[in-house]
Amino acid sequence: MINKLVDKIKKTNAPVVVGLDPMMSYIPEHITKKAFDEFGETLEGAAEAIWQYNKGIIDNTYDLIPAVKPQIAMYEQFGVPGLVAFDKTVKYAKEKDLVVIGDVKRGDIGSTSAAYATGHLGKVQVGSKKYSLFDEDFATVNPYLGTDGIKPFIDVCKEENKGLFILVKTSNPSSGEFQDRLIDGRPLYEWVGEKVAKWGEEHMGNDYSYIGAVVGATYPEMGKVLRKVMPKSYILVPGYGAQGGTADGLKPYFNE
């Protein structure tokens, strides 16, 4: 899947991902009104508004961009109807040949981690049959629990030709409370970056690994260091725009 992402970035000349993080207050009134007229002011009505809003964004961008990134919490808050909207969004984006990055930030161990990986990237066994569920192409994951939390995802990625973006240095202001803590004279995020690079070396596409990293745009100097630490890992860079990241600040995150 990393090869497809690289190819689509080159084809579109757009190293960007469109976040599909719908908030009801941002959805145009005519979309919300139509959904509420049909389903009422219900969870189903909210989910329909979200789905139609996402569909409009995808229809107007799919030939300009390589990927979309739906944030699952924005859907989960509306319960099962919200997750239906998430599922419809993922499937529609894939119909349009977009790469889908599920921004799910899962982090657990053992069978629980394996279940998360199966639900988002793999296939679940039901009797003699297997079923794909949300079926995103990539997922974001939290490495705080170590290899026990990451390996089940890597196993599914290898089997299903999928990929990961592992949180290394996040864009939020308080990320330094833990991520910048020094261990043997080096910040924790560098140690995490080294581990991502090691995992990545063992799981390569043509030129880059399908084990990528999340490094916030709000910390370009740290991004510069981490680019060198993880030369073969694609970096997902949140925080551009509203959070303060700038175009000039993004340069260190690129190899070329």
Model-derived regions: residue spans:
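N-terminal glycine-rich anion-binding loop in soluble enzyme alpha/beta folds
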Residues: 1-60
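Conserved, mostly hydrophobic/aromatic
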Residues: 18, 68, 103, 139, ...
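Active-site-proximal loop/turn and secondary-structure-junction residues that shape catalytic pockets
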Residues: 22-24, 72-76, 106-108, 143-145, ...
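Acidic (Asp/Glu)-rich catalytic clusters
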Residues: 58-65, 92-95, 154-159, 227, ...
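N-terminal active-site wall of soluble small-molecule enzyme domains
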Residues: 64-66, 70-132, 222
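Conserved anion-binding
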Residues: 108-212
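A C-terminal functional module that forms or caps the active site or interfaces directly
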Residues: 217-256
